[in-house]
């Protein structure tokens, strides 16, 4: 059965922690470009994408479901009706590739989790969507592992650089500029962002495009 790939997305005023280096319009364009990269990767891996948007939004050839509920409530409402496989994939993981996602949806466990930075959860794959309930924010990775255990579901943790890198802070742009080949990396470069070595570390600077 073809996995359903649910991608939560905030179209308006996203990525507020980047507001020091991007205007609101730029952040909205950037978030949309990252979403495009994620949709492309999950589609290439054989999943059917579904965008779970916080406000009305249109994506060509992709179904969009609008909800004003918080993230976990919105996801759990959807999961209750899903007896088939479901991939929950955050929209700010623009380094995602067909190969990285295929590795996740090929897991034999009931639940496969890709951890994110700082204890977060970047992706969850469920053999049966209705078997699970999400609990995002805070230490969501540990909470999701505990939920799998409490429900007697087998669990596999997927170690994936491509799916580990999520974009929230200015320093996160470094990995995207170095490793990214999709629309979001191209957009960043068109904005004038580029990596630079400073005091032995790589940072980003912005020049006039």
Swiss-Prot record:
**A Gene Ontology biological process annotation?**
F420-0 metabolic process
Q: Which residues form a coiled coil?
A: none
The protein's superkingdom reads: Archaea
Kindly report, in one word, the top-level EC class recorded for this enzyme.
Answer: transferase
Please give the InterPro entries that the UniProt record associates with this protein.
CofC (IPR002835), Nucleotide-diphossugar_trans (IPR029044)
E.C. number: 2.7.7.68
Q: In which pathway does it act?
A: Cofactor biosynthesis; coenzyme F420 biosynthesis
Nucleotide-binding as a keyword of this entry, yes or no, is yes
Q: Name one Pfam family in it.
A: CofC
Going by the UniProt record, its keywords in alphabetical order are: GTP-binding, Nucleotide-binding, Nucleotidyltransferase, Transferase
Q: Which reaction does it catalyse?
A: (2S)-2-phospholactate + GTP + H(+) = (2S)-lactyl-2-diphospho-5'-guanosine + diphosphate
GO molecular function annotation: GTP binding; phospholactate guanylyltransferase activity
Of which family is this protein a member? Belongs to the CofC family.
NCBIfam families assigned to the protein according to its UniProt record, in alphabetical order: F420_cofC (TIGR03552)
Complexes and interactors? Homodimer.
Job of this protein:
Guanylyltransferase that catalyzes the activation of (2S)-2-phospholactate (2-PL) as (2S)-lactyl-2-diphospho-5'-guanosine, via the condensation of 2-PL with GTP. It is involved in the biosynthesis of coenzyme F420, a hydride carrier cofactor.
Protein name, as recorded: 2-phospho-L-lactate guanylyltransferase
Which species does the entry assign this protein to?
Methanosphaerula palustris (strain ATCC BAA-1556 / DSM 19958 / E1-9c)
């Amino acid at each position: 059965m073809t996995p359903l790939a649910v991608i939560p997305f905030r179209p308006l005023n996203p990525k507020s922690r980047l507001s020091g280096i991007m205007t609101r319009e730029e952040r909205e364009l950037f978030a949309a470009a990252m979403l495009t990269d994620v949709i492309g990767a999950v589609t290439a891996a054989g999943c059917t994408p579904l965008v779970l948007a916080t406000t009305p939004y249109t994506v060509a050839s992709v179904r969009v479901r609008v909800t004003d509920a918080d993230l976990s409530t919105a996801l759990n409402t959807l999961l209750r009706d899903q007896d088939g496989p479901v991939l929950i994939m955050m929209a700010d993981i623009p380094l995602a590739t067909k190969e990285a996602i295929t590795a996740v949806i090929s897991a034999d466990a009931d639940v496969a989790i890709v951890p994110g930075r700082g204890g977060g959860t970047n992706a969850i794959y469920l053999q049966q969507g209705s078997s699970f309930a999400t609990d995002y924010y805070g230490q969501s990775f540990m909470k999701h592992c505990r939920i799998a255990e409490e429900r007697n579901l087998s669990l596999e943790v997927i170690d994936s650089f491509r799916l580990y890198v999520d974009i929230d802070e200015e320093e996160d742009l470094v990995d995207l500029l170095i490793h990214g080949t999709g629309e979001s990396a191209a957009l960043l470069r068109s904005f004038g962002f580029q990596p630079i070595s400073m005091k032995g570390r790589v940072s980003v600077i912005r020049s006039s495009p």
